[in-house]
């Protein structure tokens, strides 16, 4: 029995399902989860000592690779001064200033510890600001595990075939309206019917939790116009795509400004950190200035702030995003070419340093199209690549991530492995 199997059996005795986040359990793809012992650059090693090329990167944060020496040094410097204070620090101001500089729509920002906290707090703030209750979200978009957002969500819910989580009261779900992603007509119809009841529209401008699905410019521009017309707050959930698709995130890529933005992953540099921010007049409703309460014992934790601040500084290097985008595109295009050569129906897409793999005839644009992908074939591909030492997301409904340490040799090795995997699928 492998060490991974031993650890998984042991974990299941004290941890529900043996994992602390459902997708890690390999329930979708089958088999035994890999227990990580260490990581460096684009690689990690499992409990059996096997090396893998990592295309998850802790689900997005590791944009400069695992254990970047400058991030490590920044964390080591603050450790000796204390782990957590429950009081403000100068470093919190510095990371806030950096975020506001990089995302111009954010005039003020508040740090929290997770993406769920960020989206949950942003929605409460939008409701407090507008005095309205209804929120609009989109099918397949995942915004964390707050009750009102677990209605027809993506990520683990989609992976496990449960569109809405058990335990979400009907009285809460009734305030959430779910529309089809990228469907402008449905959006216009909803605003026409109850636009003046809508407190906020929350959207992943680049969805990464029903695999990678891009918001179309027409859809996102319609969102902006309708929210402005009806006085609703437009919330861009950029927890995943923020600092991933461009230095200024999806708002820079599309040239569209949100009222509130949720960030996470990259801004913690691998540590637990997230944030929400936006227009000053909206943020002024947060306690202690206003009546919308939000708090957190570990918000602005000095260790997380140190890792995040150094990461934000590193990604501003000249040419960083040009190189990262080109490398991610080379991976996606190369995988599609290998599949074509083997005669396997397959499509791939990338934007910035995010990519999507689809066992389908074309790149999907909606939740409905995503669910038509051949998940059985994906599962076989996943395990073939795992055997080759390449670690993709263990679900057909999750995006992948490339770091600045995924150099040509790493991409070449991945494509060579994929050539063998696609050949086996076609046999």
Curated annotation (Swiss-Prot):
The keyword Coiled coil does not apply. The keyword Cytoplasm applies. PROSITE patterns: AA_TRANSFER_CLASS_3. The modification N6-(pyridoxal phosphate)lysine is found at residue 265. Its EC number is 5.4.3.8. Its main location: cytoplasm. It catalyses: (S)-4-amino-5-oxopentanoate = 5-aminolevulinate. Signal peptide: none annotated. Its cofactor is pyridoxal 5'-phosphate. Pathway: Porphyrin-containing compound metabolism; protoporphyrin-IX biosynthesis; 5-aminolevulinate from L-glutamyl-tRNA(Glu): step 2/2. GO terms for cellular component: cytoplasm. It is an enzyme of class 5 (isomerase). It comes from the Bacteria. One of its GO terms (biological process) is protoporphyrinogen IX biosynthetic process. Homodimer. Belongs to the class-III pyridoxal-phosphate-dependent aminotransferase family. HemL subfamily. This is Glutamate-1-semialdehyde 2,1-aminomutase. It comes from Burkholderia ambifaria (strain MC40-6). The gene is hemL.
């Amino acid at each position: 029995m492998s060490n991974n199997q031993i650890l998984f059996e042991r974990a299941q005795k004290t941890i529900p399902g043996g994992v602390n986040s459902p997708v890690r359990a390999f329930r979708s793809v089958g088999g035994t989860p890999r227990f990580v012992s260490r990581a460096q650059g684009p690689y990690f090693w499992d409990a059996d000592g096997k090396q893998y090329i990592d295309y998850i990167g802790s689900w997005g944060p590791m944009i400069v690779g695992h254990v970047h020496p400058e991030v490590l040094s920044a964390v080591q410097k603050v450790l000796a001064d204390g782990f957590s204070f429950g009081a403000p620090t100068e470093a919190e101001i510095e990371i806030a200033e950096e975020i506001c500089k990089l995302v111009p729509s954010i005039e003020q920002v508040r740090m929290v510890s997770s993406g769920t906290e960020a989206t949950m707090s942003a929605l409460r703030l939008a409701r407090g600001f507008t005095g309205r209750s209804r929120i609009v979200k989109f099918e397949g978009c995942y915004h964390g595990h707050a009750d009102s957002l677990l209605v027809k969500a993506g990520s683990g819910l989609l992976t496990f075939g449960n569109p809405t989580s058990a335990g979400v009261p009907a009285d809460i779900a009734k305030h959430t309206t779910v529309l089809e992603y990228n469907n402008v007509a449905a959006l216009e119809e909803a605003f026409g019917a109850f636009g003046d009841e809508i407190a906020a529209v929350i959207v992943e401008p680049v969805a990464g939790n029903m695999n990678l699905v891009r918001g179309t410019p027409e859809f996102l521009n319609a969102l902006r116009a309708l929210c402005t017309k009806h006085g609703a707050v437009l919330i861009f959930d950029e927890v995943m795509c923020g600092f991933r698709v461009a230095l200024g995130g999806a708002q820079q890529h599309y040239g569209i400004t949100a009222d509130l933005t949720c960030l996470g992953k990259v801004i913690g540099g691998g540590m637990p950190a997230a944030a929400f921010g936006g227009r000053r007049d909206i943020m002024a409703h947060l306690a202690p200035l206003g009546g919308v309460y939000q708090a957190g014992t570990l918000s602005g934790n000095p260790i997380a702030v140190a890792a995040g601040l150094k990461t934000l500084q590193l990604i501003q290097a000249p040419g960083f995003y040009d190189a990262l985008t080109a490398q991610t595109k080379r991976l996606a295009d190369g995988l599609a070419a290998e599949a074509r050569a083997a005669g396997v129906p397959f499509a791939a897409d990338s934007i910035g340093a995010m990519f999507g793999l689809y066992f389908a005839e074309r790149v999907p644009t909606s939740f409905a199209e995503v669910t038509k992908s051949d998940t059985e074939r994906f599962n076989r591909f996943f395990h073939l690549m795992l055997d080759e030492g390449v670690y993709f997301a263990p679900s057909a409904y999750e995006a992948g991530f490339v770091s600045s340490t995924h150099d040509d040799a790493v991409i070449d090795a991945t494509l060579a492995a994929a050539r063998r995997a696609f050949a086996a699928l076609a046999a």
